[in-house]
């Protein structure tokens, strides 16, 4: 996803002429991060891994012919982050280094009730760029999900075996056939 710059000074800032972060000591860097987080919050901009992943996945799907166009689900929709034009529900989970996804809370009355049509798992690199996108239909999620007793919810262990079971939508890694 490219950043559109409003002016040449914006481009210069992105190249590093605005501030060379390598010149800051650790304390200065932490203070800068705190100030940036404060300003993001003031503007209502979230920079949590999960929310960044949701936006990147929706944008990726919408930019690729052959993939459904997705719309962000209404705020507060339980376990659903995006909707296709055909009404299919997508739950999007994002990770960088984690060993499992975030939780999927079951229906209070029926623990096995279908909550979405697809679980999409997005892997981001440490620069918050898409590294891989995996898609699981509901039935596959049900077969490989695990129960978190503390959270009273489902999650997906991010083992190689489980990731290999998914439909690989995008992968930044070079294939072994290259």
What residues fall within each predicted segment?
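Nucleic-acid endonuclease domains
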Residues: 1-178
């Amino acid at each position: 996803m490219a950043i559109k710059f409003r002016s040449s000074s914006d481009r210069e800032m992105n190249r590093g002429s605005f501030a060379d972060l390598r010149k800051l000591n650790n304390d200065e860097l932490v203070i800068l991060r705190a100030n940036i987080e404060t300003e993001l919050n003031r503007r209502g901009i979230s920079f949590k891994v999960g929310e960044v992943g949701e936006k990147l996945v929706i944008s990726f799907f919408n930019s690729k012919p052959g993939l459904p166009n997705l719309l962000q689900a209404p705020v507060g929709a339980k376990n659903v982050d995006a909707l296709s034009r055909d009404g299919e529900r997508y739950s999007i989970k994002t990770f960088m280094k984690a060993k499992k996804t975030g939780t999927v809370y079951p229906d209070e009355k029926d623990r096995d009730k279908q909550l979405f049509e697809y679980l999409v798992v997005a892997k981001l690199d440490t620069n918050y760029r898409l590294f891989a996108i995996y898609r699981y239909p509901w039935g596959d999620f049900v077969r490989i999900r695990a129960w978190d007793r503390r959270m009273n919810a489902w999650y997906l262990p991010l083992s190689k075996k489980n990731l290999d079971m998914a439909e690989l939508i995008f992968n930044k890694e070079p294939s072994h056939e290259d």
